[in-house]
Amino acid sequence: MATQQFDITSPLAPDAAFDRLIDLTRVNEWDRGVTNPRQIYGSGHEVGSRYEVTVVGFDGKPAPVVYELLEVDRPARFVMEGTNAVFCAHDVITIEPTDTGCTVTYSAGLELLEEDPPLSPAQLDSLFVKVAGVAEDGLRSYLNM
């Protein structure tokens, strides 16, 4: 499994940052690798809510991914898992208050599911550094607007 983690400081209060991040229908506002986010199950942002997004697959073609909220502890933490036929993504977002706003820690893991995956572990690690970098840059702007 490839993993990445980064921290972002924000002037937003923890509640405000949490509300912006858990709304997965807005993920395309901070991750340019994601399009067409929509909620497909549940109402609001509680455990079990599911969202479908489109990402660029390893073959360069659009690929749907369904994310489910596994844990929600407002305003401190939530966990989501995204799956499709090729991979499983596991993301943990924690938010800690600071004197000037909050610090968001984003921990992400990506595991290939196929018996004959399209990438070697080294290739996946290298690719995931780039994918996480795009998300980090987007989140830094999104949480500091």
PLM regions: where:
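Glycine-centered tight beta-turn/hairpin loop motif at sheet-sheet or coil-to-beta transitions
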Residues: 1, 60, 86-88
